[in-house]
């Protein structure tokens, strides 16, 4: 790898790290509900796709089932989701979002909209699409 490319990659890495910190700081400063992004992703998943088994949630979020247990425990204690037995297979637990969970999700969506607009609002639609494509290319 040539020296200029190496320098550019290091600068890119540092910029991505700075953006990560900015997103985390913005999330924390606006997070009046006290939930992580993963908690909100679970609520979003259940709201859009319906009840799920913990293993399906783990697969979608790309975390372990143990991680899902930790995340869902806080949401259950808060009354935002419920754990029920699957009617077809009594051995299988199923996670469902509650009415209160839907309300909290709406509040979170508003916070996320505000956060993303604050961070990316100065970009054009074309720049946002280009950035998205570049991130997807890096992930593959």
Question: Could you describe each region identified by the protein language model?
Answer:
Residues 1-33:
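N-terminal leader segment of winged-helix/HTH proteins
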Residues 41-44, 103, 130:
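Pre-recognition alpha-helix immediately N-terminal to the DNA-recognition helix
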Residues 25-64:
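N-terminal helix-turn-helix DNA-binding core of bacterial DNA-binding proteins
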Residues 6, 11-12, 16, 107-140:
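Terminal interaction helix/tail motif
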Residues 33-39, 98, 121-124:
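Short helix-coil-helix linker/hinge
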Residues 87-108:
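Basic, amphipathic "hinge/linker" alpha-helix immediately C-terminal to the N-terminal HTH DNA-binding motif
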Residues 50-93:
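Canonical helix-turn-helix DNA-binding module
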